[in-house]
Amino acid sequence: MAPLSGEWLEALKDEFHQPYYAKLYKTVMQEYQTRKIFPPADDMFNAFHFTPLSQVKVVILGQDPHHNDGQAHGLCFSVKRDVEVPPSLVNIYQELHDDLGCYIPDNGYLEKWAKQGVLMLNTVLTVRAHQANSHRGIGWEQFTDAAIRILNEQDRPIVFLLWGRPAQMKKSMLNNPKHLILEAPHPSPLSAYRGFFGCHHFSKTNEFLVQNGLDPIDWQIENKAEQENKE
């Protein structure tokens, strides 16, 4: 699997020497060799690759990767450009439209957010094809908890967006008064109507960033053709 590099490698280096990580690594490698696993192994740490620790301004916590073909590429809620936008992301786009007036794009590729400092971290980084939560409990949670603790310790303001109960269970790890914690129900169609719609998390995030002298996030994901023209 593609190793971590740069700032996150330095920040998380102690984890790689822990007994749980040796077991996790062995399990994950065996799974990739014997089963269909998402995301592709080289994309597993993309959340960390795209958003170095020193650049993190916002953290969005997901659960585990999308588990259907061609979707997952290492950023929570995001899918590759040519894949149908998943239901939770449809609802995220709807809230963005209602909150900030963003148009609803034709794809679910969220790399633009990650490149601006939005760490899009699943708490479990791999999954078996078509089996949600199949890698829960194999050790990823310990690893991503270590990342969350490191983020909490940063001596600068960070916004944590905690959507749904699993993400909100991490709130107890976040006790740095510099940070802003925003909570809402999960954007899934099963729960979005309970308060994700109307939460205004995107505008609240930007207000907080600006108040703290930071550039706001440009949340507008462009249509596929426009993204490709910029590359």
Range-by-range predicted roles:
Residues 196:
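C-terminal substrate-binding/active-site "lid" region of AdoMet-derived donor-dependent transferases
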